[in-house]
Swiss-Prot record:
Regulation (activators, inhibitors): Inhibited by Hg(2+).
Record protein name field: 4-pyridoxolactonase
Organism this protein belongs to: Mesorhizobium japonicum (strain LMG 29417 / CECT 9101 / MAFF 303099) (Mesorhizobium loti (strain MAFF 303099))
Enzyme class: hydrolase
GO biological process: vitamin B6 catabolic process
Length: 268
């Protein structure tokens, strides 16, 4: 793993109304969007950024999001396409803990876990309008206990093996891999900048901007905790991309996702 490689793990898709994707702008109607995780193979280890959604959880709690997910799009299945198992991942980083970004955390009791220091407390005690976003609590025994949802925990999940290192601000995760603080969508949201020896950097907006249109128009999703911070974060992402000459990749943009490399293909 001397050269940095980035794999996008296809996690299936979900549906939202257009007015939720593009807050107060639309147009309305069903918008099917991708969900994916980011695997970084690096000289310092294997880093997994986000873990997608759990199909059974969505069908139980948010069936109106109409999940489509095949076996190879689960976290174990997607890793299996690369000849890997969950135990091969060294570090799991969660950009935030909305259900479509943490559904596979339960497969990594052994891994070091990192998130913004405000995210676990927020999942324990979300705002009334955040309860569905923070509805899959299988990532944290602490959060599940706080919300009376311990039935969600995979057998063997404990506080000891589901504890996170809390960070704040922009943080170097590894050489050439940087977490970019972009609050607004959630209280402690992170975007991701990855640099490579032989190609331009990639800046993953994650949910700071669902789509290319979102970033170009500074139109955030309807799911947020601080819309002013969200707009400022989008401006920060745009400037970082310009300053670094980075390629932008979006979290929930189906048109762009169709052009991304997935499966065994990689960036590096």
């Amino acid at each position: 793993m001397s050269d940095t490689k980035v794999y996008l793990l296809d996690g299936g898709s979900l549906v939202l109304d257009g007015y939720h994707v593009f807050w107060n702008r639309g147009p309305g109607g069903e918008v099917r969007f991708p969900v994916y995780s980011i695997l970084i193979e690096h000289a310092e280890g294997r880093f997994l950024i986000d873990t997608g959604y759990d199909y059974d959880h969505v069908m139980k709690v948010l069936p109106f999001e109409k999940p489509i997910q095949e076996k190879h799009q689960t976290i174990p299945g997607a890793l299996g396409l690369l000849g890997l198992e969950p135990r091969d991942i060294d570090v799991v980083v969660n950009s935030h803990f909305h259900f479509d970004h943490c559904g596979g955390n339960k497969y990594f009791p052994h891994a070091k876990k990192i998130c913004h220091r405000s995210e676990v407390p927020q999942a324990c005690n979300p705002q009334p309008f955040e309860h569905l976003g923070y509805s899959d609590l299988s990532f944290s025994a602490e959060a599940a206990e706080a919300r009376g949802a311990t039935a969600q925990l995979l057998e063997g999940t404990t506080r000891a093996n589901s504890t996170f290192e809390g960070i704040d601000g922009d943080v170097d995760l590894a050489r050439g891999v940087k977490l970019i603080s972009t609050p607004g969508h959630s209280i402690g949201h992170y975007s991701l900048l990855v640099e490579f020896p032989r190609r331009k950097p990639i800046l993953f907006t994650i949910d700071a901007a669902y789509t290319q249109k979102s970033l170009e128009t500074l139109c955030q999703a309807a799911f947020h905790i601080d819309p002013v911070a969200g707009v400022n974060s989008m401006r920060k992402v745009k400037k970082l991309a310009e300053d670094h000459g980075a390629e932008l990749m979006y979290s929930h943009d189906m048109d762009n996702f169709k052009t991304y490399r997935t499966g065994t293909q990689f960036y590096g």
